[in-house]
């Protein structure tokens, strides 16, 4: 990895399918970041174990997520792409940070309380200490910036707390990581049924997945929620309509978007025509990503090499951190 650049760390879920919200909310910004930062991007397979995924699915999930990220534009030559479980130093730092974490603060984390409410039959220690493992993911590379969503901001605050506690007790080692601010580049994609963020939607027909077929993309967009049109010129635009225009602005020629915006303002818009235009433009945008990801998944040897090379880069960084941490704590005996 290049020296002199700020270090960025971010995790990629190994469960579920990547969708358009992931692409425009995170992956597209990762692609920009890889030019200017030392980036460590990992597939969070250890984190997924809190939900006890079927072992026979885990490898395929990791390969698929890796392939979709590379197909979207992440360059393994510019970033470290690795599986979390390939870096044993993360597990060791997780253990050390647990000695600086307190039961009371972990139980107060909103995401933990949500999990307890939603899955009371599986309140395991991994769920409770999830923020500690996330902190180890970040601090093991001494990252200074972390792209996180709103639901992860408290976890990042805890990572700063653990860094402060370690530094105060043993000596300066960890920078206090801050959230990466994407500014105007942050795009929030809503579900097609107008019920909230695409990432939170439980309606598969309201979510555009990166592996959707052309026909499924068209079908989903044609079913997207609309209304009867503006009641008067200049009327406020409902969220569901604004979301369609947001999607158009991302994949459609500016002059075409402008024509539909004008039609909306003068109350002549035909949503069916707008959806057909958006559907074709979305197919043209998503199909190359899907096709490249599918091709990559047919070459497991290539993906294995990416993971192996990424792990080597990540371990080189992590080993230095753990060596320094052990020395400061006093557990270097020879």
Where are these regions (language model features)?
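N-terminal Rossmann-like or analogous alpha/beta NTP/dinucleotide-binding catalytic cores
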Residues: 2-136, 294
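Short, solvent-exposed beta-strand edge segments and adjacent coil->beta transition regions
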Residues: 15, 143, 203-205
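Conserved nucleotide- and phosphate/pyrophosphate-binding catalytic cores
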Residues: 22, 154, 160-334
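Internal, conserved structured core segments that host functional sites
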Residues: 114-166, 170, 190
